[in-house]
Amino acid sequence: MFKKVVIVLAVILAALAAFVATRPADYRVVRSRTVAAPPDVVHAYVSDFHKWPEWSPWEKLDPAMKRDFSGAPSGTGAEYHWSGNSDVGEGQMTITDSRPPQSVTIRLEFLKPFAATSTTQFDFAPSGAGTNVTWTMNGHNNFMAKAFSAFMDMDKMIGADFEKGLAGLDAATVAARRQ
């Protein structure tokens, strides 16, 4: 009897491992929104990590989050490290490329609760009196991340936060222009 149970468990584990192995290795999340501000204003809000608390959806999850800024004040070379509650974890972002007013590319490294690295890009295109902002995140799933993605949809999970962030970016840039 014990031998049969072990064989059944081994078959189940092998089937689960085979299923996880067939999951996509890469993920991509993309959201866009037209923001009621010109590209140079929107670019300035994204390329300066000091302005992220005004619009980033994750900043609101832990008002007591510790933030450290280093490197350039904004643009290429700017760095931002955060450490907070279980909702935000710990990680850092580095702007690896900033092309005013067209784009900002960021290396995003999560340290806690799990280690992961992604590339995030913001693209800005004039659209009437505003700017079409496209926020993209690309990353690679290791075996454990593939297992996680079997039960959680990255596009739905991160996409909802991107939508909140783009709405916050719109509100922050509009408010800044009124001052």
Place the predicted regions along the sequence by residue:
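Residue-level recognition of beta-strand microenvironments
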Residues: P38, S98-P101
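Extracytoplasmic/periplasmic/luminal assembly and interaction segments
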Residues: F49-R99, K146-F148
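Short, surface-exposed coil-to-beta transition loops
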Residues: R28-V30, V88-M93, A115-Q121
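Generic structural detector for well-ordered beta-strands
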Residues: S32-A36, H81-S83, T94, T105-R107, ...
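Hydrophobic ligand-binding cavity/cleft-lining segments
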Residues: K4-A72
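Beta-strand/loop substructures that line and gate deep hydrophobic ligand-binding cavities in soluble
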Residues: T96-D97, R107-E163, L169-A171
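Short, highly charged C-terminal tails/helix-capping segments
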Residues: R67-D68, D170-Q179
